[in-house]
Amino acid sequence: LLTGQHHWRRFHGIAQAYDGPVFQPDDFTIAKIFKEKGYRTAAFGKWHLGWDFDAIRKPGVAKEDWVKAESYDWNKRFPGGPTDQGFDHYFGDGTINFPPYCWIENDRFVTIPTKPVIKSEPLAGGGTFRPGPMAESWNPYDILPTMTEKALEWINEQSPDQPFFVYLAFNSPHYPIVPNKEFHGKSKAGYYGDFVIETDAMVGRVLIALEKGGLAENTLVIFSADNGAETHAFERLEAFDQWSSGKYRGVKRDIYEGGHRVPFIVRWPGQIEAGAVSDEVVSQVDLAVTFADIIGYPLGSDVAIDSYNLLPVLKGEDYDRPLRTATVQNTSPGKFALRQGDWVLIDASSGAARKEEKHYLERLGLEAYGERNEGLLFNLKEDP
């Protein structure tokens, strides 16, 4: 999303706890081009792209002691985060279930993690914390409303005459599932459903702030997600007869549609027709070229190499269909899928990252695929 380039071109998987930044200092990001064009830029919430822990780790600390709070100098600058990648301002918690568990503003720690988390008990809605340092007052239920409030404070400071770009990365509905009490029971689909309802409420607060500030008519808002539901979706299927992936097979980490097909909702008054729907296959990597076109930033051929311009799609204008010849999808190392029109080719014996549960297969009328398959080919129109 931030680079216009598929992550598998550089690495597979995710940045783990205590990993360094996935970015090189001269990497292209959309925040950098907004900043160059005079926009104020801010990021709030999750930053699951690594930090420079070496910069704050005390000399001579053994790897097995990385989880200890005393292994770090929390008063030092914490580099490698959003403010090194084009954002003027950042407030967030890094990653909700990865240490350190504390608030970070720009490149400094606001709350100091002093107590250790050795083993976390599962929270009521599901999910745990990885071992590592935690601030004494840390409460996971505060994270979603706090990051939203900080984003609203920043937005309310903006003037209609000063362009701005905000990247608001909610922790919800990622593990741990921590909906606040006022949302309990709202969804009738357990704590996960309630967490989704709370997320919707936070999005609503952002839209209201734009309206009250006189910014809504000239602000492009995009709402999306990074992957499908976690594996607790199987339990919700049994408990509530609710399947988070809709009519699609798969959950997070699967290369089936349910693993990566996500919402993509756009609002831009006067530019995009309200209620319009497109069935064009698009990707979040397309935002880079799209944003560059909107702000008049010329991109070189060596950056945002996987990105396509979505403007004609969003505006309902004529364009050569399809937008792209094919879309490449990837999950674990060596497991890829190629989407072309209604067809999906999975270059693996199964699109699942783990054994699929029997009750799930039976309820959705699916079959498990054996390890001897050389690959799988689906027509999504006939077999979603």
How should each PLM-predicted stretch be described?
Residues L1-L376, L380, P384:
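Formylglycine-dependent sulfatase
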